[in-house]
From Swiss-Prot:
The lineage of its organism: Eukaryota, Metazoa, Chordata, Craniata, Vertebrata. This is Protein EVI2A. Belongs to the EVI2A family. InterPro entries: Ectropic_vir_integratn_site_2A (IPR008608). The chain crosses the membrane at residues 126-151. It comes from Mus musculus.
């Protein structure tokens, strides 16, 4: 009866230890599942393989005694998978951290190159626009100066032609210059004799003698 009581007591202790160990390992399994699937699978296999071994050792220990089972209790807790998972977790972010700065540097270099190319293209476009504007301004000034020079030449030619022409002094001169009256007509001769400086130089006697001669010539023609 004493052996049976000890056996039951050992079984009760082992069940409590197994329950505590399983409750402690469950959060570890869930944490490993969040970090990586492969690590969780390996830890589950290790935990499942170790629990039967613990049960086997516990089954053997009742024959030995209560002291041996007490010494075997600390062996039931599995600290090794936690260390392995922590190393996996610490190693994977470190790799990502090492790879991220290089990608950032490359992206920064590409953006800098793009900005430099855009600045160069904008500068060249500005230079081309300034050159075109300067050329158009020069062409406009050249055309303006050429028109001014041509206008001055035309005005000078008109003035020279007007100076070369003789302006008519009276209506008779204008008609004679235009060719409406012949230069040898009697009316033109009479008007020229009666007007001008010749009339002032002639005396009254000379005029009467000339008239008498003309009158005599007219009577002779009638006879």
């Amino acid at each position: 009866m004493e052996h049976k009581g000890q056996y039951l007591h050992l079984v009760f202790l082992m069940t409590t230890v197994w329950a505590s160990s399983s409750s402690g390992t469950r959060p570890n399994y869930t944490h490993l599942w969040a970090s990586s699937v492969t690590a969780s699978g390996s830890s589950n296999q290790n935990g499942s393989s170790r629990h039967p071994s613990d049960n086997n050792t516990n089954l053997v220990t009742p024959a030995v005694g209560h002291k041996v089972s007490a010494t075997d209790k600390p062996a039931s807790s599995p600290p090794v998978p936690l260390a392995s998972t922590s190393t996996l977790k610490s190693s994977t972010p470190h790799a990502f951290r090492n790879s991220s700065p290089t990608a950032e540097i490359k992206s920064q270099g590409e953006t800098f190159k793009k900005e430099v190319c855009e600045e160069n293209t904008s500068n060249t476009a500005m230079l081309i626009c300034l050159i075109v504007i300067a050329v158009l301004f020069l062409i406009c000034t050249f055309l303006f100066l050429s028109t001014v020079v041509l206008a001055n030449k035309v005005s000078s030619l008109k003035r020279s032609k007007q100076v070369g022409k003789r302006q008519p002094r009276s209506n008779g001169d204008f008609l004679a210059s235009s060719g409406l009256w012949t230069a040898e007509s009697d009316t033109w001769k009479r008007a020229k004799e009666l007007t001008g400086s010749n009339l002032l130089l002639q005396s009254p006697g000379v005029l009467t003698a000339a008239r008498e001669r003309k009158h005599e010539e007219g009577t002779e023609k009638l006879n």
